[in-house]
Amino acid sequence: MYKKYIFLLGLLLPLSLFAQNFSKGSVVDENNTPLIGADVYWEGTQIGTSTDNEGAFTLKRPEGSSTLVVSYVGYKKKTVKVSDNTPLHIQLEPETTLEEVVVSYKRANTMKSQWQVADVHTMSSGELLKAACCNLSESFSTNPSIDVNFSDAVTGNKQIKMLGLTSPYILMAEENNPTMRGASQAYGLSFVPGTWIESIQITKGAGSVINGYESISGQINYEIEKPISAIPFFLNLYASEDNRYEINAHTNKKLSDKWATTLFAHGNVRQQKADHNHDGFIDNPIGNQINLLNRWQYADAQKGWVGFLNLHYMKDERQAGELRFNPLTDKGTTNAWGSEVNSERFSVSNKIGYVFPDTPHKSIGLQNSFQSHKQDSYFGLNRYDIHQKSWYGNLIYNSIITNTKHKFATGLNGTYDDYNEMLSTMALTGDFSRVDRSVGAFFEYTYDNLSNFSFVAGVRADSHNHLGNFITPRLHVRYNPWKQATFRVSAGRGKRAANVIAENQQLLASAREFTIVGGDGGKLYGLNPEIAWNYGVSFLQAFKVLGKNAEFSIDFYRTDFDNQVVVDLDNSPQQALFYNLNGNSFANSLQAEFSITPAKGLDFKAAYKYYDVQTQFTKGQLEKTLTPKHRWFANVAYETPERHENNHSQWKFDVTFNWLGEQRLPTTATNPVVYRLSDYAPSFATLNAQITKVFSKTFEIYVGGENITNYKQENGILATNDPFGAYFDSTMQYAPAFGQMYYAGLRFKIL
């Protein structure tokens, strides 16, 4: 494979090293902040590109073309007349105002670029804040690329999947800083309030080598609101009929033309127990969370400096279990089954970047992040505590080779993870503490013919005290064969250390005995590292239907594991086996999507997804459990025109439909008949809706409903009458455990 890379680079490096007639420039927002990934193309042609990490672009100018079109999600499309080769400075305006984008909940803020090399979907805050109380785990309900499922019927925790694989195989990053690793893997998505997020970039398949070696099925990167562009004050209040109450507040202060700071505060609470299905267990955990973030930004565009400093503290407490459980008297006893998960997190991170003023294609950046994450928890008589202290650092340099057709990024990064991990169960008790250290170097080359073809080839070399020394290659290719069509291919390798207990701690809420089968000399719980290759192909076509904008996309991705830590729940209903893969394990994912804007303010999106995920277990090659093969998705959003004579008032409506096909369940064949489930869970459908009344630019209210179809899983928890017995299991959750849920709230801001 490496010979192929060298041969390909050798072919393409000499191309077009002579002067060309091209246009270059930069794209910024209304505060002169660079817009990364903005689309820039010549009107009436298929020649385009996307802006780089500094918002800069270079584009070949075809004969007869004189008008550039620039677009970015959440901003008005802009056309620019070009008369010569003078560098352009293009400033985009928000679709309404930036403040309205921050708190707008309309669905249409999703963009699939035709000119980015990787298969990236960008979601703005209008898409993310669809669920009024949302945290990051609830931000994907209107995006068919991400599946959101409950991990079990007790903790209420949500887990996401991409390309048929669960979140440990997805690299989660905050502003390209890897996060939610190890100790925070299970609950970390619920620790990021949705109102803090400016945008999310979803990358399917192999990611960039710049961000590390762990990504296998894809990457999800979220951007936090920037102090330089934030509004002075924002408030969101929320209440639901399942007794959840939430407050989000942001306050911003611009200290000078270069310095600004924002304080983010979030709190939620649920203290009233409810048991609507009368199984003796509460439907949702009770508890509370306090979440604070102080963010500082420095920006000096003339001198080329930009910097961020983040101080973050979070404390989350949740209690689940039987309705009659009282932790003061029942913890550690068999009086009543209960669980408590208490998490505390503190992090400090900074990012410094410098763009050379005379050569804007050259830049250097430094990232540092320190995190401390502590979780104390128990599930019935099973005890699990983990404290992880982590450091991540990344130094990157960007420049060109000869001209802007040939760009490269190179640098160093390192990680340090100190795990203090203790597990106490009837079958497995021990101290699994360890220290992981790694250092790596990367080089990524980008070729763009400034027209219809580009590719990114990257390689990194890492040394890890437990994973060894290894190479990670990755490749992305983009080709525009005809007008408004984009064809992409990607391939890459990923390697990671499986945190067996932290990533599967929901299984502790059952009677299953944990058994780790080592024996191969593995350094991680006696097991070997996980290694996989991901290959993908995608096609995107934009077109008109009766004069209305429409888009169709289809993609196929396959993941092949060289080694995987297999989680086997089929050997016995009373056991959870963990062992190295001995055979084949793969995940095939096919997705087709269609979207159209049939009328002004009206958007429609529909998608179909097919999964084929199989693993070699002790009992043979079997489908992955709790993974539907078929899924249908549809979303309709409508906004009435703004009434400018009436304080910009309007109505917003949104409806989302999901249908999930049957899913294989872990075997319960050896249980007594009363505690057996069928081999497959039935298909089911859910419907969510939200109505927003905007009274003015500063005030709006909303009401909504989830699971309006009122589908409820029967027997979500096995053996509720004997939770300390051998057949208790809360991990068979494939559908909602409770029925319809309605909520209401308000949003207020000072502009």
Name these PLM-found stretches:
Residues 28-33, 38-43, 71-75, 83-129, ...:
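Short, acidic, small-residue-rich periplasmic hinge/interaction motif at the N-terminus
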Residues 60, 137-178:
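Extracytoplasmic beta-strand/coil segments of soluble accessory domains associated
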Residues 85-91, 136-139, 158-161, 187-193, ...:
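N-terminal periplasmic accessory domains that precede
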Residues 270-291, 297-364, 370-388:
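Flexible loop and strand-edge segments within Gram-negative outer membrane beta-barrel domains
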Residues 363-377, 480, 488, 525-580, ...:
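Membrane-embedded beta-barrel scaffold of Gram-negative outer-membrane proteins
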Residues 448, 553-560, 580-666:
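Gram-negative outer-membrane beta-barrel transporters
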